[in-house]
């Protein structure tokens, strides 16, 4: 008798669950808040997801992109966390290293990194630091020995353009002056062209994805002095990795641990997040739709045309990583405060 009742109940209520999933997003619009300016590589990845994800969400909602740049995506992250409704209709694309700012206690932070809804990551990419070729800084050793350190440009402390030069100082003794306050990576590149600064750190993927870098490489305007991967990227076979340099300069174990925490941002990559508190069934819908989106044949062709690498990570994996990186002991946090100048 009991099994029969259970079967009847499942038959009666199962369709309504499926119906609710299908109808919630029907005739709705999902807004993807991009924390970087239009045209940046982060923005290109966000728009690519927005273009295709709607067809994999039951109800086929419209998906629009709203750019909200500022302070290395801090403005967008704070907005998604504190203003957007937790209904699954606002998602976002932010830079991956904003957890630094929470760990070191910056007052601008209005979010709890662990409480974001993690939907997925389009790609994992290591970092590089490029240098104008008409400077005397041809190698890391030149930078280490320089009486006057090179100037690198950066948006804010949560951008790789800021923290990678600082990490190189801590781990291998290469000194830099980092000039912050630029609105975007593109603005930093323009500053490099004008001669205001000589260098910038950011992802390998972006360096090989768009202009002006293809033209710069052809003209020899810049060269890459270091990359952060465990092994050399196939596109940069002659550029030393940070692990190689740490071995060469006998970096301490403490500094190697610091590097591991900082470079965890590589694994977070180009994340798509949601507000805290999205109902579990909608989180499931968004995560499943993301995985289907980054496997879509049309999207893969589009990514290839735009020279955008794909190495996706699931929302579940991102959530686990986010929890792990926030569980840092006090000594590591103090080292990060020193590195970030807080």
Short names for language-model regions:
Residues 26-30, 218-221, 225, 247-248, ...:
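An extracytoplasmic/periplasmic, membrane-proximal ligand-sensing/linker region
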Residues 111-122, 175-181, 212-265, 314, ...:
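Short beta-strand->loop
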